[in-house]
Amino acid sequence: MDRIGGPKTEAPAKGAPLFDAAQLKRQTHGNPSLQVEVLALFMAEAERLMNQVEDAADPQLRAERLRALIGLSRNTGAALIAQQARALETAIASENPDLTPLRAAIADTLAYLKRTGG
């Protein structure tokens, strides 16, 4: 991943945009090398947090990891991940909340970032 490119947003059929490059640019003050670094960290951290959400037996721990994922995603421009994590956080009272939409949002966003170079 050596540059930031592609359209400002890539939206799925409905819901939040998959990725908002303008948000990333704002957060990094337009610094391309910082954008590359932030995206690399985001990609690793999003997977780590999702794994922790999936593995958490304790609802409180799951909620904490979801809040971390929401903040990370919003700051980086991964709007769909933030939206799906927020929806899951709202449904966390359920004993077995459906993690599939969030896992799919992460997979789609990471695939997009890998495909476009950011």
Where are these regions (language model features)?
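An anion-binding catalytic pocket shared by soluble metabolic enzymes
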Residues: 69
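All-alpha amphipathic helical-bundle segments outside canonical DNA-binding/catalytic cores
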Residues: 57-64
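Amphipathic, coiled-coil-like alpha-helical segments
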Residues: 1-22, 33-44, 48-50, 72-87, ...
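Short amphipathic alpha-helical boundary/capping segments
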Residues: 24-25, 29
